[in-house]
């Protein structure tokens, strides 16, 4: 019994759909997802992979079928049918990519917005008014226009979604130089060549380049942000999986660009506290002397004793100076 062509086409469509859906979710091309935001990025990547797999199987399948079905037969000297264009087919293969691209654009915009890429707290009108003001005040100076653009209150960065904006993040200052990353923790005074942060707590990286443009990239977080000289940028994330992850410069920054790497350590809260305790700078003796003390119960000699010792002044000399009268009145 001959199987109808419509049934064969339906079966082929079902097979292509099943294979595309399975491979789109099980391709294994992405590294481990170390944050909730990474799962959002993986969602759009898996969606794109599903569509790409289906299109690949469909197009390559049609090509292989045509190569076999319409190959030149032995002793066939005839010409093919004079077909010139196919308007319905051209409309179809124009409409399908249009729908796919539009769907991907809407989906990617939604993901980018959820990641905090569009900062609703920064007014774009404010930036425009500032640019117009500088343009009117310094009509002939393009240098002022460029400097204004760098100093404006324009959001440059990516961060948490709106539901997590109220959480107090761990602040880390990041300096990108050829060819290293320097991480400074203002809360503890720690300076490190590696990034350390606890899981399940937002981390805000305030980044700036010291020479050329760099790009801060942690693949496991699915986040990348340009680091620009003279202009700060921000990257906010919330790691969810403990581990060691590479920090990579993703912008060609010089001859040794490939060696500009560091490590991000995602600790448990207890491990992070231990790291801070082990690496926090110890207060020096001079710093300890500046700490507040209960001075109300001290005598003048007791209060001045530590300072006199540091200056090399003996208490006996201070007592002699106290007993002496000033000769200033005799000189006047």
Swiss-Prot record:
Q: Which GO terms describe its molecular function?
A: copper ion binding; cytochrome-c oxidase activity
Q: According to its UniProt record, which cofactors does this protein need?
A: Cu cation
- Primary location class: membrane
- What EC number(s) is this enzyme filed under? 7.1.1.9
Ligand binding (Cu cation): 214, 249, 253, 257
The record's annotation in InterPro entries points to: CcO_II (IPR045187), CcO_II-like_C (IPR002429), Copper_CuA (IPR001505), Cupredoxin (IPR008972), Cyt_c_oxidase_su2_TM_dom (IPR011759), Cyt_c_oxidase_su2_TM_sf (IPR036257)
Q: Topology relative to the membrane, per the entry?
A: Multi-pass membrane protein
**Is the keyword Transmembrane helix in the record?**
yes
GO BP of this protein: ATP synthesis coupled electron transport
This protein's superkingdom? Answer: Bacteria
Q: Where does it localize?
A: Cell membrane
Textual note on the cofactor = Binds a copper A center.
Family per similarity comment: Belongs to the cytochrome c oxidase subunit 2 family.
- In UniProt terms, what function does this protein have? Subunits I and II form the functional core of the enzyme complex. Electrons originating in cytochrome c are transferred via heme a and Cu(A) to the binuclear center formed by heme a3 and Cu(B).
Q: What is this protein called?
A: Cytochrome c oxidase subunit 2
